[in-house]
Swiss-Prot record:
Localization terms from the record: Secreted
Lineage: Eukaryota, Metazoa, Ecdysozoa, Arthropoda, Hexapoda
InterPro entries linked to this entry: Fibroin_P25 (IPR009911)
Protein name: Fibrohexamerin
Domain of life (superkingdom): Eukaryota
GO molecular function: structural molecule activity
Gene from which the chain derives: P25
Cleavable signal peptide: 1-16
Entry GO terms, CC: extracellular region
Length: 218
């Protein structure tokens, strides 16, 4: 059975009205209230470290861009400003048995030595290498947690909205890479959408497991 922290629920119900199935039990800046409500409806560990490093490194991060027939490897991916993320929405839909948690991440900074593997039919793959750093004005992560009385971040889907294109700097490591990389940015929005089909689980888990409740998945 879905459980709420009663003192917060009373306020939320007054705001929502009796006919509304959506319950917002917490202020968005009240991580303790969010933690209490999530931990009451899951098996997560509420004893979290309470902070995110301003900068941390992932040794290897793989992603694909099917539209461009390419695979990518971010080597020594440096992530900055994940600690600046803030909760932008949190509610339970009682009728749908679902909880929604959204997090806004301003100025998300990603830097890596990237390997690009270009695929083509009936041909060998071609590999290119470059250093890249991109700063995203705002990435909005929205996670739908099904079975609201048995919440599990580890198997939940997180959608990333790239609200604005990044400011980035690219340093090709050789002449073939420099010649290959396009200066035409007209398809950058498609590229970023495909890229951020892969990044959300790591970003939301870092935030939730560090600040709200630890589900034990990386």
């Amino acid at each position: 059975m879905l459980k709420f922290i009663i003192f917060a629920l009373t306020v939320a119900l007054c705001e929502a009205g009796p006919a509304n199935n959506v319950v917002r039990p917490c202020r968005l800046d009240d991580l303790k209230c969010i933690r209490d409500n999530i931990s009451a409806n899951s098996n997560c560990n509420a004893n979290v470290r309470g902070s995110i490093p301003s900068e941390y490194v992932i040794p290897r991060f793989n992603f694909e861009t099917p539209f461009f027939n390419a695979s990518y490897i971010d080597n020594n991916l440096i992530i900055r400003n994940n600690d600046a993320c803030r909760v932008s929405e949190f509610f339970f839909n009682v009728k749908a048995d679902t909880s929604v948690l959204a997090v806004d991440c301003p100025n998300l900074d990603l830097e890596s030595d990237r390997t690009l593997i270009q695929h083509a039919s009936l041909q060998e793959e071609t590999t290119y290498n470059y250093h890249i750093r991109g700063i995203y004005p705002l990435i909005r992560l929205t996670t739908n947690l099904l079975n609201a009385d048995r919440l599990n971040l580890c198997n939940a889907f997180t959608y990333a909205d790239v609200t604005a294109l990044p400011i980035f700097k690219i340093d090709p490591k050789d002449r073939p890479t420099a010649n290959f990389l396009s200066r035409d940015l007209s398809l950058l929005n498609i590229y970023e959408r495909e890229t951020f089909a892969y990044r959300p689980p790591q970003l939301i888990r870092q935030f939730v497991n560090s600040l709200i409740c630890d589900f034990g998945c990386q």
